[in-house]
A protein has these predicted regions:
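Low-complexity, acidic Ser/Thr/Pro/Gly-rich terminal tails and inter-domain linkers that flank the onset
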Residues: 546-576, 719-740
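Terminal connector regions
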Residues: 648-700, 810-813, 832-874
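A surface/secretory-pathway sequence property marking extracellular, secreted
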Residues: 605-647, 771-814
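Ser/Thr/Gly/Pro-rich low-complexity, disordered linker/stalk segments of secreted
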Residues: 34-107, 697-723
């Protein structure tokens, strides 16, 4: 992480000492791409008794951060909101796998397939994204994360990239990364176009720069970090759950406490982004340029890093700020044509640190500035600086100074991220070797150096250091989310649950020694800046050697075990049964903290009794909101345990495992022999079995949700469509005749011969809003389940309410559910929507007379505005 300190970061040592072994053995399922093992809602039952008190509970609290108000730049904010260009290609019908299903494009002539390597390196940045992910994200194990970032400052600071294997957003290395990626596209756009990776590259660059714009709410205020590095590094868990574990403070620089290095680097990134998007999205380009100019003026005015303190110990600005001021000024000159920027670049360059025997990196960009200035001016000051630097990395300088080479050929600079330095120096060498100012005698030397360093990274030694590429690649990177621990322990599970495809690990020591272990952050951590120069190098090599890319590519994985419930009998007798139940949340596709987690313990009511004759009490319960006996059909009943909202999540020993002990009075001990358990996440069955009305245990079908025992709405056989397309609809409800929400798990299947445009689909659900209170819509989960087994989540679903006038029978309000993304619903594909309609105060509805509740054919499906299923209320 640091440039020259060569000291172990204290938080890293703390992790290794503090994290403890633990865990639960888990099994892998073969369901591809599903976020939940089943999609069956909790069957309808009626409440007979509720116990709301608990004797013990586990809770955690963290210090709240002081809120900071800030001004905004109105014109800039408006420009950002109006920008709607996609982050990546829209037509992602399914989430592919890292192996893909074939190759396309120009076959390569190089030693390695640089097209595939480039493709995978870009995917890594999608896996590092923070915030609300777009629907075209090519992964089923990454989810939305850190959606409250900036709330302590009254701002939306969501987005950006997580730095490395941690969950902090450090803007200095992030801006450097976005700058280098942008430089690569600027330099070798044709390589990205030919390999069909331009949209992905631009999507990643835009993702970072849109975040930087959020971080700059006023002329002289810039938020440079979100998350406390020490607190973050003291916890080992997935990014999707970090905000439930700790506060994420926001840190800023301003006129009183400036930070010229980080604001200068961000100005460079935004200037490059403005160039790249000038012809694609002019409005966004102008917004980027406006912020770039403002941030540069801020950095140039104060020339101080006095306020840049929160990153100390992680990303200190060792080289100062003049290198960033020179580097950013050249890019602003290229973006604007304003010669004053070129003059400032030349003025500040000699004031920057001039270490020729290091590498272009997040801290020191003076060599990057020298390359650009050599291209712009051809002056010897810059060409000689670049060549001395590259001579050091290749044949040696005139005075005999030369980089250390490992026995197997890696140009080795430092123990922390050795490959990051070598591949970035190789990128600089490849760019300079093709420039007009490079002496002909050195062109091949620099180019061959670039090829050789890429070869070392990709497999020349018998192993690839790029995850998911080549032979014998690393499988235990130091990365919290990819490792997938649920118990705050980097050794549990022992094998990473996810493949962090495309990431370049730190690399070997000076003797080619390398240890593929999660605990070694020197050699096996990954980081955004590690891949930056490496990506540029791959694109440059593609320009000469080409290479094919994978079709059906992505970070889609088979879903492993995510939930489990273990029960045992604590005690029992002829008239009571005491149960101990342990509920485990090991979710990882993606990791998540359920809003509603419900455990049900099903049993048979003794002959001669009813559920109302029984009572339940608890002697111990962790984060239990309520304990209730519910009557089912026939002689079945269950104990319903509702856990507190988002209390059970994969974040530690206490967080991922919840224990409850309860006693059922009136139930004999032998009832346990035929009992069963089921666990529901937001109304959908995720573990266990549900009994039918006769008491026999049935297992829900994995492809279609099982109907509840008393409230079923099977699909009608003859809907009345008026538009094109043919579908059937089934819906399962999680409530009975009354409740505080209309919660449904709806499946829409394309049974026709023609594909249906997902973007044109809408669903109208009709009901009565008796209290006329404010309404809210929640989509807990939505996805397309393909007939071939693939599964693609949808994150954009929304619901809009309309009054029906005059009122119809069973309907005075409609909820239109739409925004199912792009792509097609092919024949045999199913659109799954788990939704909830509720009042703002969660007051009850009378559900018994709702129009759409009376049958699935009373739910109207439209395609392109025309009804293709269902009947409107008359």
């Amino acid at each position: 992480m640091q440039k020259k300190a060569k000291i172990a970061v204290l938080c890293g040592i703390f992790l290794i000492v503090a994290l403890v072994l633990g865990g639960v053995v888990y099994a892998w399922h073969n369901t591809f791409g599903k976020k939940k093992t089943e999609e069956t809602p909790a069957p309808e039952t009626s409440e007979t008794e509720t116990v709301t008190e608990e004797t013990e509970e586990s809770s955690s609290s963290s210090e709240s951060e002081e809120e900071t108000s800030s001004d905004t730049l109105p014109s800039e904010t408006e420009s950002t909101e109006e920008t709607t260009a996609p982050d990546a290609p829209i037509e992602i019908k399914t989430i592919g796998t890292i192996k893909g299903d074939g190759y396309e494009g120009t076959k390569g002539t190089g030693k390695y397939n640089y097209g595939e390597a480039l493709q995978k390196s870009l995917l890594f940045y999608e896996l590092q994204r923070s915030g609300k992910l777009p629907e075209n994200t090519r992964s089923n194990w990454r989810g939305d994360s850190c959606l409250k970032d900036g709330s302590d400052a009254g701002l939306d600071l969501t987005g950006g990239w997580f730095d490395a294997g941690d969950n902090v957003k450090f803007n200095l290395p992030m801006a450097y990364t976005a700058s280098i990626l942008g430089w690569s596209v600027y330099e070798d756009k044709d390589a990205y176009v030919e390999s069909k990776q331009l949209d992905y590259a631009l999507g990643n660059i835009r993702w970072a720069n849109e975040y930087f714009i959020k971080c700059h709410p006023s002329e002289e205020k810039y938020f440079y970090q979100v998350g406390d590095g020490n607190a973050d590094h003291g916890w080992w868990g997935p990014c999707e759950c970090v905000e439930y574990q700790m506060n994420r403070p926001s840190y800023f620089v301003d006129a009183q406490n400036p930070g010229s290095a980080v604001t200068g680097e961000t100005a460079a990134s935004l200037a490059i982004c403005s160039i790249l998007f000038k012809d694609i999205d002019p409005a966004f380009s102008e917004t980027c340029l406006s912020h770039a100019k403002s941030l540069y003026a801020f950095a140039d005015k104060y020339k101080s890093d006095a306020g840049y303190t929160a990153a100390n110990g992680f990303y200190n600005s060792w080289s100062g700020f003049y290198d960033e001021l020179s580097w950013a000024a050249v890019w602003l000159y290229r973006a604007t044509g304003d010669a004053s920027y070129l003059s400032r670049a030349k003025e500040y360059y000699p004031k920057a640190n001039q270490d020729f025997n290091w590498s272009l990196c997040w801290d020191d960009v003076h060599i990057g500035a020298a390359v650009l200035l050599s291209q712009e001016t051809g002056e010897k000051t810059y060409t000689q600086a670049v060549e001395k630097h590259l001579d050091f990395w290749t044949t040696g300088t005139a005075s005999g100074e030369r980089i250390t080479y490992t026995p197997k050929g890696l140009a080795w600079l430092d123990s922390w991220g050795s490959l990051r330095y070598a591949t970035t120096a190789a990128f600089v060498a490849s760019v300079y070797s093709e420039s007009d100012v490079c002496p002909s005698a050195k062109k091949d030397i620099y180019w061959d150096f670039a090829v050789n360093q890429a070869g070392y990274a990709l497999g020349d030694t018998g192993r690839s250091f790029m995850i998911g590429f080549g032979e014998n690649y690393p499988v235990h990177p130091h990365h919290r989310t990819a490792q997938g621990s649920y118990s705050d322990n980097m050794n549990d599970p022992g094998t990473s649950r996810h493949v962090l495809c495309g990431a370049l690990v730190g690399g070997p020591d000076a003797s080619d020694g390398y240890e593929d272990t999660v605990t070694n952050y020197n050699t096996n951590e990954v980081a955004c800046d590690y891949n930056a120069g490496f990506t540029g190098l791959l694109a440059k090599l593609y320009t000469r050697y080409h290479g094919q890319t994978l079709t059906g590519f992505g970070a889609g994985e088979s879903v492993g075990e995510e939930y489990r419930v273990d029960t045992s009998v604590n005690a029992g007798g002829s008239d009571f049964l005491e149960i101990k139940a342990l509920t485990y949340n090991m979710t990882g596709w993606p990791a998540r903290a359920p809003k509603a987690l419900e455990l049900r313990y099903y049993f048979t009511v003794p002959s001669g009794k009813t559920a109302s004759d029984l009572s339940v009490s608890s002697s111990f319960g962790q984060d239990v909101a309520s304990l209730t006996i519910l009557a089912g059909d026939g002689n079945t009943a269950c104990v319903q345990v509702l856990f507190k909202e988002r209390a059970c999540y994969p974040g530690g020993q206490e967080e991922y495992k919840k224990e409850v002990q309860f006693r059922i009075t009136g139930l004999p001990q032998d009832a346990a022999s035929s009992a069963s358990v089921a666990l529901f996440e937001d109304g959908s069955l995720v573990f266990g079995q549900v009994p039918d009305g006769s008491g026999n245990v049935v297992t829900p079908a994995p492809t279609a949700p099982t109907q509840g025992p008393s409230d079923t709405t099977p699909a009608p056989t003859s809907p009345a469509p008026s538009g094109n397309g043919k579908v059937t609809v089934s819906i399962d409800y999680s409530m009975g005749g009354s409740g505080n929400a209309i919660s449904g798990n709806m499946t829409i299947e394309n049974t026709g011969s023609d594909a249906i445009d997902l973007g044109s689909l809408s669903v109208d659900y009709y009901f009565t809003n008796e209290k006329s209170g404010a309404l809210a819509f929640d989509c807990y989960h939505s996805a397309v389940s393909r007939k071939d087994g693939n599964y693609a989540a949808i994150n954009s679903v929304k619901g809009e309410f309309s009054k029906i006038e005059p009122k119809k029978t069973g309907a005075d309000t409609s909820c239109t559910i739409s925004a199912f993304g792009s792509g097609k619903l092919e024949k045999g594909d199913k659109l799954i929507v788990q939704f909830s309609i509720h009042h703002g105060d969660w007051s009850d509805f009378n559900l018994s007379d709702d129009y759409s509740r009376s049958g699935a054919d009373k739910i109207v499906i439209r395609s392109g505005g025309k009804i293709i299923y269902g009947t409107e209320p008359g």
